[in-house]
Protein backbone atom coordinates (compact mmCIF):
# COMPACT_ATOMS: atom_id res chain seq x y z
CA UNK A 1 0.00 0.00 0.00
CA UNK A 2 1.51 3.36 -0.96
CA UNK A 3 2.30 5.88 1.74
CA UNK A 4 -0.51 8.31 2.52
CA UNK A 5 0.58 11.34 4.53
CA UNK A 6 -1.68 11.85 7.60
CA UNK A 7 -2.48 15.45 6.66
CA UNK A 8 -6.08 15.39 7.89
CA UNK A 9 -4.94 14.00 11.25
CA UNK A 10 -2.61 16.95 11.75
CA UNK A 11 -5.31 19.37 10.65
CA UNK A 12 -7.50 17.89 13.38
CA UNK A 13 -4.70 18.04 15.96
CA UNK A 14 -3.93 21.70 15.22
CA UNK A 15 -7.62 22.58 15.32
CA UNK A 16 -8.90 20.56 18.29
CA UNK A 17 -6.03 19.12 20.36
CA UNK A 18 -3.16 21.62 20.24
CA UNK A 19 -4.83 24.69 18.76
CA UNK A 20 -2.38 26.68 16.67
CA UNK A 21 -4.87 29.56 16.87
CA UNK A 22 -3.37 30.45 20.26
CA UNK A 23 0.12 30.54 18.76
CA UNK A 24 -1.01 32.68 15.83
CA UNK A 25 -2.14 35.33 18.31
CA UNK A 26 1.56 36.01 18.98
CA UNK A 27 2.94 38.73 16.71
CA UNK A 28 5.86 36.56 15.60
CA UNK A 29 3.53 33.90 14.19
CA UNK A 30 0.76 36.12 12.86
CA UNK A 31 1.43 34.78 9.34
CA UNK A 32 0.60 31.22 10.42
CA UNK A 33 -3.14 31.55 9.89
CA UNK A 34 -5.14 28.32 9.48
CA UNK A 35 -5.14 28.61 5.67
CA UNK A 36 -1.32 28.83 5.68
CA UNK A 37 -1.02 25.90 8.08
CA UNK A 38 -3.36 23.80 5.93
CA UNK A 39 -1.48 24.73 2.76
CA UNK A 40 1.87 23.78 4.32
CA UNK A 41 0.53 20.42 5.51
CA UNK A 42 -1.11 19.65 2.15
CA UNK A 43 1.91 20.62 0.04
CA UNK A 44 4.31 18.77 2.31
CA UNK A 45 2.00 15.75 2.20
CA UNK A 46 1.96 15.79 -1.61
CA UNK A 47 5.75 15.94 -1.75
CA UNK A 48 6.03 13.11 0.78
CA UNK A 49 3.72 10.89 -1.26
CA UNK A 50 5.06 11.70 -4.73
CA UNK A 51 8.78 12.33 -4.12
CA UNK A 52 9.95 10.86 -0.81
CA UNK A 53 7.92 7.68 -0.31
CA UNK A 54 8.94 6.20 -3.68
CA UNK A 55 12.59 6.47 -2.52
CA UNK A 56 12.13 4.33 0.60
CA UNK A 57 12.43 0.92 -1.08
CA UNK A 58 15.26 1.86 -3.49
CA UNK A 59 17.12 3.25 -0.48
CA UNK A 60 16.82 -0.15 1.22
CA UNK A 61 17.83 -2.09 -1.88
CA UNK A 62 20.70 0.20 -2.92
CA UNK A 63 22.22 1.71 0.24
CA UNK A 64 24.93 4.35 0.25
CA UNK A 65 28.43 3.13 -0.53
CA UNK A 66 31.98 4.43 -0.71
CA UNK A 67 33.55 4.68 -4.17
CA UNK A 68 37.05 6.10 -4.66
CA UNK A 69 36.76 8.18 -1.50
CA UNK A 70 33.30 9.52 -2.40
CA UNK A 71 30.08 8.40 -0.71
CA UNK A 72 27.37 7.58 -3.23
CA UNK A 73 23.81 7.95 -1.97
CA UNK A 74 20.91 5.70 -3.03
CA UNK A 75 19.34 6.40 -6.43
CA UNK A 76 17.07 9.44 -6.33
CA UNK A 77 18.17 10.70 -2.91
CA UNK A 78 20.02 13.74 -4.25
CA UNK A 79 16.99 14.71 -6.33
CA UNK A 80 14.67 14.07 -3.38
CA UNK A 81 16.78 16.26 -1.13
CA UNK A 82 16.84 18.98 -3.80
CA UNK A 83 13.02 18.89 -3.91
CA UNK A 84 12.86 19.30 -0.13
CA UNK A 85 15.30 22.21 -0.23
CA UNK A 86 13.62 23.94 -3.17
CA UNK A 87 10.25 23.74 -1.39
CA UNK A 88 11.70 25.65 1.56
CA UNK A 89 10.92 22.93 4.10
CA UNK A 90 14.39 23.01 5.66
CA UNK A 91 13.86 26.54 6.96
CA UNK A 92 10.19 26.30 7.86
CA UNK A 93 10.79 27.44 11.46
CA UNK A 94 13.95 29.45 10.83
CA UNK A 95 13.85 33.23 10.97
CA UNK A 96 13.03 35.15 7.81
CA UNK A 97 16.23 37.19 8.12
CA UNK A 98 18.21 34.38 6.47
CA UNK A 99 15.53 32.87 4.25
CA UNK A 100 13.37 30.88 6.65
CA UNK A 101 9.57 30.96 6.95
CA UNK A 102 9.44 31.65 10.71
CA UNK A 103 6.44 29.36 11.20
CA UNK A 104 5.68 27.68 14.55
CA UNK A 105 7.90 24.76 15.55
CA UNK A 106 4.79 22.62 16.06
CA UNK A 107 4.20 22.85 12.31
CA UNK A 108 7.86 21.98 11.70
CA UNK A 109 7.49 18.89 13.92
CA UNK A 110 4.36 17.82 12.04
CA UNK A 111 6.13 18.29 8.71
CA UNK A 112 9.08 16.15 9.81
CA UNK A 113 6.69 13.46 11.03
CA UNK A 114 5.11 13.35 7.57
CA UNK A 115 8.54 13.24 5.95
CA UNK A 116 9.89 10.55 8.31
CA UNK A 117 6.86 8.42 7.57
CA UNK A 118 7.54 8.75 3.86
CA UNK A 119 11.29 8.07 3.93
CA UNK A 120 13.13 8.48 7.21
CA UNK A 121 16.55 7.76 5.72
CA UNK A 122 16.19 10.71 3.34
CA UNK A 123 14.58 12.98 5.93
CA UNK A 124 17.50 12.58 8.33
CA UNK A 125 19.38 15.13 6.22
CA UNK A 126 16.98 18.10 6.58
CA UNK A 127 16.17 16.99 10.13
CA UNK A 128 19.83 17.19 11.15
CA UNK A 129 20.14 20.58 9.46
CA UNK A 130 17.21 21.79 11.57
CA UNK A 131 19.21 21.08 14.73
CA UNK A 132 22.17 23.13 13.53
CA UNK A 133 19.90 25.97 12.41
CA UNK A 134 18.23 26.14 15.80
CA UNK A 135 21.55 26.02 17.68
CA UNK A 136 23.03 28.78 15.52
CA UNK A 137 19.95 31.00 15.85
CA UNK A 138 20.05 30.78 19.64
CA UNK A 139 23.77 30.69 20.38
CA UNK A 140 25.96 31.88 17.49
CA UNK A 141 27.40 35.33 16.91
CA UNK A 142 25.94 37.49 14.14
CA UNK A 143 29.04 36.75 12.08
CA UNK A 144 28.55 32.98 12.29
CA UNK A 145 24.82 33.29 11.64
CA UNK A 146 25.49 35.29 8.46
CA UNK A 147 27.97 32.67 7.30
CA UNK A 148 26.05 29.48 8.04
CA UNK A 149 22.31 30.13 8.25
CA UNK A 150 21.59 31.14 4.63
CA UNK A 151 23.38 28.05 3.33
CA UNK A 152 21.79 25.66 5.84
CA UNK A 153 18.29 27.09 5.40
CA UNK A 154 18.52 26.98 1.59
CA UNK A 155 19.81 23.41 1.68
CA UNK A 156 23.10 24.32 0.00
CA UNK A 157 24.87 23.00 3.10
CA UNK A 158 23.64 20.24 5.40
CA UNK A 159 23.95 19.60 9.10
CA UNK A 160 25.68 16.42 10.24
CA UNK A 161 25.52 14.04 13.17
CA UNK A 162 28.95 13.21 14.60
CA UNK A 163 28.41 10.60 17.26
CA UNK A 164 30.63 7.62 17.22
CA UNK A 165 33.96 5.90 16.63
CA UNK A 166 34.60 2.52 14.99
CA UNK A 167 35.00 0.62 18.28
CA UNK A 168 31.99 2.27 19.97
CA UNK A 169 29.09 1.88 17.57
CA UNK A 170 25.95 2.94 19.44
CA UNK A 171 27.71 2.69 22.84
CA UNK A 172 28.37 6.40 23.34
CA UNK A 173 29.98 5.62 26.71
CA UNK A 174 32.79 3.78 24.91
CA UNK A 175 33.95 6.89 23.04
CA UNK A 176 37.60 7.81 23.59
CA UNK A 177 37.56 11.27 22.01
CA UNK A 178 38.95 13.89 24.36
CA UNK A 179 39.31 17.64 24.14
CA UNK A 180 41.99 19.09 26.37
CA UNK A 181 42.71 22.82 26.61
CA UNK A 182 46.04 23.80 25.08
CA UNK A 183 46.43 27.47 25.97
CA UNK A 184 43.99 29.40 23.81
CA UNK A 185 43.09 26.41 21.65
CA UNK A 186 41.58 22.97 22.06
CA UNK A 187 43.51 19.86 21.11
CA UNK A 188 41.52 16.81 20.20
CA UNK A 189 42.71 13.23 20.36
CA UNK A 190 40.35 11.15 18.31
CA UNK A 191 40.17 8.06 16.21
CA UNK A 192 37.99 8.07 13.11
CA UNK A 193 34.58 9.63 13.73
CA UNK A 194 31.62 8.57 11.61
CA UNK A 195 29.59 11.38 10.07
CA UNK A 196 25.95 10.99 9.15
CA UNK A 197 24.84 12.80 5.99
CA UNK A 198 27.62 15.34 5.42
CA UNK A 199 26.19 16.32 2.04
CA UNK A 200 23.36 15.39 -0.29
CA UNK A 201 23.92 17.66 -3.29
Language-model segments: which ranges?
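Amphipathic, small/basic residue-rich leader segments at the start of a protein or domain
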Residues: 1-123, 147
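Flexible, glycine/threonine-enriched loop-and-boundary segments that flank and lead into catalytic domains
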Residues: 70-82, 93, 162-181, 195
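Core alpha/beta catalytic barrel or barrel-like domain that forms the active/cofactor pocket
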Residues: 91-96, 118-134, 155-165
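Flexible loop/turn segments at secondary-structure boundaries
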Residues: 98-102, 131-135, 143-144, 167-171, ...
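Internal maturation/activation junctions in enzymes
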Residues: 128-129, 140-185
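Short, intrinsically disordered, charge-balanced linker/junction segments flanking boundaries
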Residues: 185-189, 201
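Conserved small/polar residues in nucleotide/adenosyl-binding loops
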Residues: 193-199
Amino acid sequence: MPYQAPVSEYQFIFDKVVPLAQVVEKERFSEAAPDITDAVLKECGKMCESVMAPLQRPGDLHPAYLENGVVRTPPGFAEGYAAIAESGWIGISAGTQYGGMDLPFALNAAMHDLMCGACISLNLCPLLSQGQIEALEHHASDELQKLYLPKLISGQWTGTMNLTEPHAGSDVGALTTKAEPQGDKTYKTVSYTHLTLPTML
